[in-house]
Regions:
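SH3-family beta-barrel domains
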Residues: 1-13, 26-30, 45, 50, ...
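Catalytic cores of transferase enzymes with a strong primary signal for eukaryotic protein kinases
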Residues: 2-13, 17, 37, 59-62
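Short alpha-helix capping/helix-loop boundary micro-motifs
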Residues: 18-24
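SH3/SH3-like beta-barrel superfamily modules
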Residues: 27-63
Length: 68
């Protein structure tokens, strides 16, 4: 089930897959609220990786706060 997260850093990398072993897309989230549609465990993030609804890629949930 999709959920929203808040990102408070400007330069959170978006990656092509769920882990630091996947390439960076060259894009960053910026600060704001984003919808996560899938979560997977992966290298480099204790909280897991979230797939952005926009289709842009995956972000580390270590740097995102889940919203109610």
């Amino acid at each position: 089930m999709p959920f929203k997260v808040k990102v408070d850093i400007l330069d959170l990398n978006i990656r092509t897959g769920a882990g630091t072993d996947y390439a960076k897309t060259g894009e960053h989230t910026g600060k704001g609220e984003f919808t996560i549609v899938e979560v997977k465990a992966g290298k480099g993030s204790a909280a897991g990786w979230g797939r952005l609804k926009s289709g842009a890629g995956w972000i580390s949930l270590d740097y995102a706060t889940r919203l109610a």
